[in-house]
Amino acid sequence: MKLYKAKNTLSERHVQADRTADAKVPDDLWRTCPKCQRTLFAAQMDEYATCPGCGYGFRISANQRLSWLVDSAVPMDTALQTQDPLNFPGYEGKLKKAQEKSGLNDSVWTGRARIGDVDFNLGIMDPTFIMGSLGTITGEKITRLFEDATKNQRPVVLFTASGGARMQEGIMSLMQMAKVSTAIAEHDAAGLLYIVVLTDPTTGGVTASFAMEGDVILAEPRALVGFAGRRVIEQTTHTEIPADLQDAENVLKHGFIDHIVTRQDEKTTLAWLMKYGGKQND
């Protein structure tokens, strides 16, 4: 069988065979850690989706995190529906696609949860939903989460993962920063505990508001934590910044984070903090 044509090029038959073989290989068969560049066989990764080399936690959905984080959970405000107040081109289609992919009505899951004998209110931002962007329904759900916790004297745990305010909703998206912060202040005034867990990525308006307002601020290893992105900083300052400038470990070193916790330890750490660091209900 002739492999090459006269001009020393692969025959069309072999090119087509290569394309057919490539099409049979799943896109998610291999994963590359964005931090240490280690190539991982996806099927060998555990339920926590962490890199065995550097501990980086890959971006996961809210439902994936729920599966190993809590013993039980009941969702809240699932009927709220995101609108398109500015008639932004293509936004409705993007929303529908994100809702189908994530199974959520917007970029955050909220509800009442339990770990062991500790009851608390839980919020998990989902980076698979338009990169966890902060929209009006996201802000409304988190606000209601804190209001419910204040009313029922419960601590709140919030996992942040966001690219910032959602541009398709304009100023109404930015308003959520102040609205959520007000609900947090009322929760704090009631003497209740608020724990934040920063995951990759936590940036923009979320970092500038409720992500940094916790009584205890935890972070996952190697998580990106910052306000503006690396490229924006470098273009604005005309200075090349260190590769690890916005890594959680560096943010911890400068005092903005209290502790870094692996996903494997999050459940026990949160239970301990809420049991001994928060107001107890009789």
Swiss-Prot record:
Cellular location(s): Cytoplasm
Cofactor binding notes: Binds 1 zinc ion per subunit.
Protein residues bound to Zn(2+): 33, 36, 51, 54
InterPro entries found in the cross-reference section: AcCoA_carboxyl_beta, Acetyl_CoA_COase_Trfase_b_su, ClpP/crotonase-like_dom_sf, COA_CT_N
CoA carboxyltransferase N-terminal domain ranges (all copies): 29-282
Pathway assigned to this chain's UniProt record: Lipid metabolism; malonyl-CoA biosynthesis; malonyl-CoA from acetyl-CoA: step 1/1
Pfam assignment, any one: Carboxyl_trans
Reactions accelerated catalytically: N(6)-carboxybiotinyl-L-lysyl-[protein] + acetyl-CoA = N(6)-biotinyl-L-lysyl-[protein] + malonyl-CoA
Necessary cofactors: Zn(2+)
EC class (word): transferase
Molecular function in Gene Ontology: acetyl-CoA carboxylase activity; ATP binding; carboxyl- or carbamoyltransferase activity; zinc ion binding
Chief place where the protein resides: cytoplasm
Keyword terms: ATP-binding, Cytoplasm, Fatty acid biosynthesis, Fatty acid metabolism, Lipid biosynthesis, Lipid metabolism, Metal-binding, Nucleotide-binding, Transferase, Zinc, Zinc-finger
Swiss-Prot/TrEMBL GO biological process terms: fatty acid biosynthetic process; malonyl-CoA biosynthetic process
Chain ranges of zinc fingers (C4-type): 33-54
Keyword Transferase in record: yes
PROSITE patterns documented for this protein: COA_CT_NTER (PS50980)
Any one GO cellular component localisation term in the record: acetyl-CoA carboxylase complex
EC nos: 2.1.3.15
Family statement drawn from the similarity comment of this UniProt entry: Belongs to the AccD/PCCB family.
Function in brief: Component of the acetyl coenzyme A carboxylase (ACC) complex. Biotin carboxylase (BC) catalyzes the carboxylation of biotin on its carrier protein (BCCP) and then the CO(2) group is transferred by the transcarboxylase to acetyl-CoA to form malonyl-CoA.
Subunit-structure text: Acetyl-CoA carboxylase is a heterohexamer composed of biotin carboxyl carrier protein (AccB), biotin carboxylase (AccC) and two subunits each of ACCase subunit alpha (AccA) and ACCase subunit beta (AccD).
PANTHER family found in the cross-reference section: ACETYL-COENZYME A CARBOXYLASE CARBOXYL TRANSFERASE SUBUNIT BETA, CHLOROPLASTIC
Protein name: Acetyl-coenzyme A carboxylase carboxyl transferase subunit beta
Source organism of this protein record: Limosilactobacillus fermentum (strain NBRC 3956 / LMG 18251) (Lactobacillus fermentum)
Name of the coding gene: accD
